[in-house]
Amino acid sequence: KQRVEFLEDLLFTHRGLSGPAVLQISSYWQEGTPLAINLAPTVDLPAALAQAKARSRKLIANELATLVPSRLADTWAQREADWQRPINEATDKALARLAEQLARWELTPTGTEGYKKAEVTLGGIDTRALSQQTMECKTQPGLYFIGEVVDVTGWLGGYNFQWAWASAHACAQALPA
């Protein structure tokens, strides 16, 4: 089982999860497979919550809103009665549970928006079937494949565009004048 991690933005929309993190993981996700999402990947949640408990009397949701978006903090704090109180009144066990759940939110997506809305595709002509220099099919001379029809997948950030341009250039250089 392959473990894949991304440190990218995550968007909550009216249709579900989206954003760069979802687009990245969609290349690897298999239907029915759960995902574990760290909702505060750059924060040491146990330490931050312990520090807040020692110095603050704010509601847990309000302290949490200094670490994650406020609407997420409000929604998350509503999940358990132990989290609906001032942070200095919370038990260490309740805060540890909160930190663990935020750092490892597990869910199983019910599906994708489908091919019509896809921004990431996988598959295509196996690169081993093509000349690396010309993109010509090894078994069918005169037949060339470039860009997204070839099984090359890059991370977000223009890599697929770069691959399309580079493979087109290699192919064009090889074509007879």
At which residue positions do the language-model features occur?
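N-terminal low-complexity, intrinsically disordered patches enriched in charged
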Residues: I25-Y28, Q132-Q133, S167, A177
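Tryptophan-centered motif/residue detector
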Residues: W29, W105, Y115, W163-W165
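An anion/pyrophosphate-binding glycine-rich loop and adjacent beta-alpha core
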Residues: K1-K93
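A glycine-rich dinucleotide-binding beta-alpha-beta segment and adjacent secondary-structure elements
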Residues: D74-T153
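A conserved FAD-binding loop/helix module that cradles the flavin
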Residues: V152-A177
